[in-house]
Amino acid sequence: MAEVEQKKKRTFRKFTYRGVDLDQLLDMSYEQLMQLYSARQRRRLNRGLRRKQHSLLKRLRKAKKEAPPMEKPEVVKTHLRDMIILPEMVGSMVGVYNGKTFNQVEIKPEMIGHYLGEFSITYKPVKHGRPGIGATHSSRFIPLK
């Protein structure tokens, strides 16, 4: 009976980014992280983060520090869609501007190395309705309501 209870305990897959644990990623320097990223991200980090990116990281750190334990931090709004997600951003809540509104994005470990803009769609996907007059040649035979 005890063996059955032991089997019921679920084991979750530990996150790794290119074979490196999240805890080790947090301890790495930017130079070591750059070796793990793809060429585009390496080039971007090699050229350096600008003042706006540094201020976003500072605001994210502050929001995480002020959050009560076991609670999500306050949402930090930003227009920086081209910011690469770094390991220190994991667990933060970011409002990414899509041109009209700020979409809330919770940064997860799987997002490391991607851009913030990839998680905030800038257009409304098309919902196709019924064809109207002039839509196609065959739509002439569709009865009007």
Curated annotation (Swiss-Prot):
Family from the record: Belongs to the universal ribosomal protein uS19 family.
PANTHER family xrefs: RIBOSOMAL PROTEIN S19P FAMILY MEMBER, SMALL RIBOSOMAL SUBUNIT PROTEIN US19
InterPro entries referenced in this protein's UniProt entry, alphabetically: Ribosomal_uS19 (IPR002222), Ribosomal_uS19_CS (IPR020934), Ribosomal_uS19_euk/arc (IPR005713), Ribosomal_uS19_SF (IPR023575)
Main localisation: cytoplasm
S-S bonds: none
Claim: Ribonucleoprotein is one of the keywords in the record: yes
Keyword entries, A-Z: Acetylation, Cytoplasm, Isopeptide bond, Ribonucleoprotein, Ribosomal protein, Ubl conjugation
Annotated function: Component of the small ribosomal subunit. The ribosome is a large ribonucleoprotein complex responsible for the synthesis of proteins in the cell.
Protein encoded by which gene: RPS15
One Gene Ontology cellular component annotation held by this UniProt entry: nucleus
Localization per Swiss-Prot or TrEMBL: Cytoplasm
Descriptive protein name: Small ribosomal subunit protein uS19
Pfam families (UniProt xref): Ribosomal_S19
Modified residues (N-acetylalanine): 2
Assembly description: Component of the small ribosomal subunit.
